[in-house]
């Protein structure tokens, strides 16, 4: 990683995202851009531009002062960007202008609604497909050692696997595929075993076709069930540090941008989650075998 963008509203909800972004930048020797947008407060009936000039300047100065205080002693190359306006528009514009390797942010609110927990900023970045987004929820206890990537064998899932491998080269990667259990007449146990073996083979073929470095070891896991349930269960049992998913796919639950599997995973998992959109200029990988 050479460039990381932290999207923050300077609230306590983004403190963990700040700590993670600083750690990632320091470990990779990357430049960290910290961006915040001064939006109109719901409690303030006056537009920011209509405020007296000294109040406008105070908000800018206070925000910069807070960020500089937070950066003190962090030993990281950082750039601060503070603008008036909508956060989503600012982050998307910065991402397009600078081609960041990773965009880091925190959760918006702890409610049961997808839009509220992630916020419009994350939605805007995913919708415009300007880069992978790391949603930080946990306290920083060290680098990411283990990463679980959910796959439906789509190009979006492939993008998630590539991103996890490129961004975190030292982490152990596990790819999990949730398949539909065998149905219909016949020997159920035999059919289940056949479905399991077929899913494992498809998973291995998918990994090979992604064409990661030859030295990169990938573990494949397949199980019948719902993707979000299995991903969360495996992540808990295997003590996974980070989940990674693509935001488009061919699976019925991943078929739309920010589909229900992706939403349910972010909502229900306490773990940090890497959301990877398929970038507009990506082309499908060649088949292997």
Please describe what each predicted stretch is.
Residues 1-50, 146-189, 212-215, 268, ...:
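Small/aliphatic-rich secondary-structure junction motif
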Residues 20, 39, 50-55, 69-103, ...:
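Structural beta-alpha unit
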Residues 33-35, 79-83, 134, 174-176, ...:
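General small-molecule cofactor/ligand-binding pocket signal
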Residues 44-46, 116, 160, 185-188, ...:
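Short, well-ordered secondary-structure micro-motifs
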Residues 51-63, 191-201:
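A short acidic, glycine-rich active-site loop
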Residues 102-124, 143-144, 242-268, 278, ...:
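Glycine-rich, Arg-bearing micro-motifs that act as flexible, cationic patches
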Residues 107, 125-126, 134-163, 180-216, ...:
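Conserved N-terminal glycine/acidic-rich loop preference
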Residues 124-138, 268-277:
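Short, acidic/small-residue loops that bind anionic groups at enzyme active sites
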């Amino acid at each position: 990683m050479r460039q990381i963008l932290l999207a923050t509203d300077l609230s306590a909800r983004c403190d963990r995202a700040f700590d993670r972004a600083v750690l990632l930048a320091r470990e990779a020797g990357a430049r960290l851009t910290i961006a915040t947008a001064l939006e109109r407060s719901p409690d303030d009936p006056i537009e920011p531009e209509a405020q007296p000039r000294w109040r406008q300047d105070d908000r800018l100065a206070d925000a910069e002062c807070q960020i500089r205080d937070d950066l003190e002693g962090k030993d990281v190359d950082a750039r601060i960007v503070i603008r008036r306006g909508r956060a989503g528009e600012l982050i998307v514009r910065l991402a397009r202008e600078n081609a960041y390797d990773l965009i880091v942010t925190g959760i918006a609110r702890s409610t049961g609604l997808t839009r509220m927990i992630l916020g419009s900023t994350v939605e805007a970045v995913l919708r415009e497909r300007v880069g992978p987004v790391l949603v930080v929820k946990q306290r920083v206890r060290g680098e990411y050692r283990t990463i679980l990537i959910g796959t439906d064998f789509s190009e979006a899932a492939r993008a998630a696997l590539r991103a996890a491998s490129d961004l975190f080269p030292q982490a152990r990667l596990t790819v999990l595929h949730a398949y539909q259990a065998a149905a219909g007449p016949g020997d159920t146990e035999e059919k289940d075993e056949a479905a399991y073996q077929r899913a494992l083979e498809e998973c291995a073929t998918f990994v090979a076709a992604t064409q990661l470095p030859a030295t990169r070891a990938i573990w494949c896991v397949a199980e019948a069930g719902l993707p979000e349930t299995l991903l969360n269960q495996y992540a808990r049992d295997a003590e996974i540090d980070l989940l990674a998913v693509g935001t488009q796919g061919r699976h019925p639950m991943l078929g739309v941008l920010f589909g229900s599997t992706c939403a349910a995973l972010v909502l229900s998992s306490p773990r940090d989650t890497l959301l990877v959109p398929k970038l507009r200029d990506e082309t499908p990988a060649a088949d292997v075998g």
